[in-house]
Curated annotation (Swiss-Prot):
Cofactor requirements of the protein: Mg(2+); Zn(2+)
Gene that this polypeptide is encoded by: rpoC
Protein source organism: Pseudomonas putida (strain GB-1)
SMART domains per record: RPOLA_N
This protein's name: DNA-directed RNA polymerase subunit beta'
InterPro entries: DNA-dir_RpoC_beta_prime, DNA-dir_RpoC_beta_prime_bact, RNA_pol_asu, RNA_pol_N, RNA_pol_Rpb1_1, RNA_pol_Rpb1_3, RNA_pol_Rpb1_3_sf, RNA_pol_Rpb1_4
High-level lineage: Bacteria, Pseudomonadati, Pseudomonadota, Gammaproteobacteria, Pseudomonadales
UniProt entry keywords in alphabetical sequence: DNA-directed RNA polymerase, Magnesium, Metal-binding, Nucleotidyltransferase, Transcription, Transferase, Zinc
Catalytic reaction equation(s): RNA(n) + a ribonucleoside 5'-triphosphate = RNA(n+1) + diphosphate
Amino acid sequence: MKDLLNLLKNQGQVEEFDAIRIGLASPEMIRSWSFGEVKKPETINYRTFKPERDGLFCAKIFGPVKDYECLCGKYKRLKHRGVICEKCGVEVALAKVRRERMAHIELASPVAHIWFLKSLPSRIGLLMDMTLRDIERVLYFESYVVIDPGMTTLEKGQLLNDEQYFEALEEFGDDFDARMGAEAVRELLHAIDLEHEIGRLREEIPQTNSETKIKKLSKRLKLMEAFQGSGNLPEWMVLTVLPVLPPDLRPLVPLDGGRFATSDLNDLYRRVINRNNRLKRLLDLSAPDIIVRNEKRMLQEAVDALLDNGRRGRAITGSNKRPLKSLADMIKGKQGRFRQNLLGKRVDYSGRSVITVGPTLRLHQCGLPKKMALELFKPFIFGKLEMRGLATTIKAAKKMVERELPEVWDVLAEVIREHPVLLNRAPTLHRLGIQAFEPVLIEGKAIQLHPLVCAAYNADFDGDQMAVHVPLTLEAQLEARALMMSTNNILSPANGEPIIVPSQDVVLGLYYMTREAINAKGEGRVFADLQEVDRVFRAGEAALHAKIKVRINETVKDRDGSVTKNTRIVDTTVGRALLFQVVPAGLPYDVVNQPMKKKAISKLINQCYRVVGLKETVIFADQLMYTGFAYSTISGVSIGVNDFVIPDEKARIINSATDEVKEIESQYASGLVTQGEKYNKVIDLWSKANDEVSKAMMANLSKEKVIDREGKEVEQESFNSMYMMADSGARGSAAQIRQLAGMRGLMAKPDGSIIETPITANFREGLSVLQYFISTHGARKGLADTALKTANSGYLTRRLVDVAQDLVVTEIDCGTDHGLLMTPHIEGGDVVEPLGERVLGRVIARDVFKPGTEDVIVPAGTLVDEQWVEFIELNSIDEVIVRSPINCETRYGICAKCYGRDLARGHQVNIGEAVGVIAAQSIGEPGTQLTMRTFHIGGAASRTSAADSVQVKNGGMVRLHNLKQVERADGNLVAVSRSGELAIADEFGRERERYKLPYGAVISVKEGEKVEAGAIVAKWDPHTHPIVTELKGTVTFVGMEENITIKRQTDELTGLTNIEVLDVKDRPAAGKEIRPAIKMVDANGKDLYLPGTDVPAQYFLPANALVGVADGAQIGVGDVIARIPQETSKTRDITGGLPRVADLFEARRPKEASILAEVSGTIAFGKETKGKRRLVITPTDGSDPYEELIPKWRHLNVFEGEQVNRGEVISDGPSDPHDILRLLGVSALAKYIVNEIQDVYRLQGVKINDKHIETILRQMLRKVEISESGDSSFIKGDQMELTHVLVENERLAGEDKFISKFTRVLLGITKASLSTESFISAASFQETTRVLTEAAVTGKRDYLRGLKENVVVGRLIPAGTGLAYHSERKRRRDADKPLRVSASEVEAALTEALNSSGN
């Protein structure tokens, strides 16, 4: 018995390991794993169902079918354990050994492993320096390969077909050795002398000049070094022994009706054994060569199919015409071993049910049906029943529970007390998709969920289901209570704002109770205190909305914790006074003395959390909810068709718009505007009309007339139900009301372009058939989008999580003083995000000085909280350098200072926080949310009217930034640069707003001029792009030949002509090379030169330009000589958004990216080549000129002789992040990517903290490219991990050797995930075969540093409480002690974490 216990003890204990190595298996190793050779293809006997001897299920090899019982039944029972039966040869053991014992097949002829052959790049091919085609011809017996040329003229590795082989035989006899098949390949691999080859390659690489050759050689060198360093031998890539999987992992199960269900692997193994046995027989018979050859080829194909079916040739199919599932298919893909069984396991002690509302629950509770609780907590109930002495055995306890006796319910209630359960709703898009609650037993079968956590779960009650999980161990319960309790997750990890915010009915109730009405009952009364207000209201003497005065006692807590009490009389309403009763002490009365819209409530909860702490906030949130529900019931708000009041002005607005459209149509008919311009103008008109209608409608809805106390008629805010719902933020938006009571507006076609005719009707009036038909486009597109985008967004999240999963906070401070420069984010002239918001929760990297002085006002190392933000804004600081995850110098992780505040807790981030996963979830979660919300506006085209002027919002001084301008005859300036900006500064010199000025903008103010608020300071035509002259003179046309480079369009109706430049593709052959241009000459016909240069003033005209001047016309400075029509606009919808985010994270090079200057210097144009222009930049520092060929159709922003700085835009287009990184550095790249991604999310009103994007970006910048190898072992052009290179350089510097130099490389998230250190993580992500092949050949070690690897091997993850476990393991291992972390240690660690979070 003792032995048995020891045995059981050893079963569960896995020996300690720190890394997992993967390599090639040698034939000896395969034989050492094996318990015997499988010689026959038989599986089980069809009559006795017993496994056949020496077959694929043989009990002698793999172990007994029944526990402790040999096959013939001679030895049964535990006492014979370990005996080998002399009759049937089976060892008496547990049947479980059939899951772990392997066997082998001795192959009659070697077989190449298909992974190393076909998985690109082919490892066998690289090593032998032969092409894949050639090797395949040898392997599949089409050609001979020379193994040993001897003294002949043949070369080693040369391929010979049959004819050549027989000729050679005749010529040289036996002097040479040429063979075919895998044994030939094996011989060649065996003959490779790795050391000699490595030396040769290392000498050869520096001597070659061709890039491609260097690449090829360094690939070979890498592979050889990998083989040499890993202890793998090249010939092991060819199998001589094939391992056989244990039988219980490829089961054969009898079904009823005498049929069998079997794993496909058995079929594949059977084929291999059959062919192998046949080959052995043929060899024994010394059959003709051609037959043996064929059999060998078939054996090779059978093994290929077993390892990876379908990788070469047609996949082998089973009886049902489906391809058989091979070993490779078992591990890859969503249904493979990694993703299905190792990373995504099913969990016991769980259940699921439909959810309903639990409006009476407290925030930390959930309603759990008794039935479910009884099932989930069974073991606990059994234990309690026994302990109480109500049941003598577990069996008796079971019976009691089945009968559901009354005492069982009492015990259940006791068991459940303070035992949290986890509730999860799929899809779990962020960590708030699983939270812990204390269960409350309820009747019925549905789980009750607290309304305030619905936002976090994205749950509604239209049939959603949720799963319940029971944390069993004490540690698990502790973690659930301390870390996952819903009351501990009030703030969203994505942006640090409250996520437990009332919505819908609750908001409506609170809004209704805090509104004021004129001349309500009790108006003007004065009350002594809140209690009196309450009494009078209950007695019905004062209405809820009555304006009153009341004396209040408020306690105000300052940020520094000092408490001041004061008593004052406030003007307020009855409802607000009642609401103040539930507000915790410490908040001023002003927080409720306003109509409580959703934003205000959110702000209130946030303020409450920051001022009075977590506990009070939770109680307060609950009270708010109860109050809100109560008053929304009292309000009796409902919707009727009469609530949709259609404004009287609607008809007038629509008529005038229709007239204007007719006017434009007639202009088009008379040729004054082009089709594109007409389209743009019409759409602008209707957009404006739509806005006007909705303004009129809202104005109409939002006001109502009432009689005040004096009997006069006055206006007050309306109590229209629909208006209240929208205004409070409970449901609906102005855009939706506009469709109900205004007009539906413009619709989009399925391709995204806008239909010119709008829908002028609204839903109250009803749509005509045509209007209904037009609107179906948009609606249908919305639904189709939703389905597609959900999948895309989920995939984006998966890639993000994968790239960032191993990023954990591992130390407090890495000590760097690098950081990112933070400035306010300005868009369209407005400050979208002030500096304060951007630096909140960050650590200052370098001291911040008071503007204009040397006084340090914010020292480096400060964690900026709300108080500091106020301070920074008071001191009008414009820029701050803050620490960022991108610049963090911690290896294998990130430091707390560079990350800053843990957004979900509101203090500095704890060590062990998995910030990578949090970042990935924060970015991925709204992606899904947004894509699920495309169709809420019913596809109505929300296109903004194009901006055509700059109107300043604040008065102040004009500042012009890097603007080139010319002065027109009328004194106005015209911008002739593209990156110019106009800013307005206030009297302190702080910039209040900033606008981009497009090329050709007419500016009516000068630098330093004072302007009033509301002044229009610049104008331009938004629909065309002008070409402006910079000097005065006469126009001459160059290369403008009719119907060759230009076409004159004469409008049939008007007889007016305009000149349009033809696109190169539309020109006849004669015109392909001609570049039409407009040249400026003086009165004598001499060339004029651009101001300050010796470059002739010649303006090249791009395709489709419309020329607006005649040949020989006189023009002045700043006049427009040609216009380029702009593209018509498509609606910007997150549909464009999600792919945009994916493109940015995948670091894809955009099509026709903008061209940046590679060096700083002076621009010149060299000799042109076919279809390309030669751009030459002469550097300012006197080094060699830089040349670049640019396609002629690219529109250049620079003129000859202009000065450019490195990284400046030469030709417009979407930016290429790789160029930004190369030319402008990491900070510029970070700024670009963060801003671009934020723009997409901001468009949808989603807030994500910048640091999440930076965290992902850090992972994308992990790799560097070696530019000079110095004394290191790196090869130039290699991609290495940054940490590796830094460690190596430190070592070299310590030995006074030359360090290697490198440049940073930006990898897309997919590529970064696949090139991670850990092969387990990469293999479980994508391209499993390729990753494992590469890892095996190089003999990779996985040090299990990330989260994923540890989940796969079944350990605690090295994050959170698991980090303590791992560091303790490491400490113990260093001290060499047995390891066990006790519950008390975990508890201590948790308490510490909680204490720090409580502060």
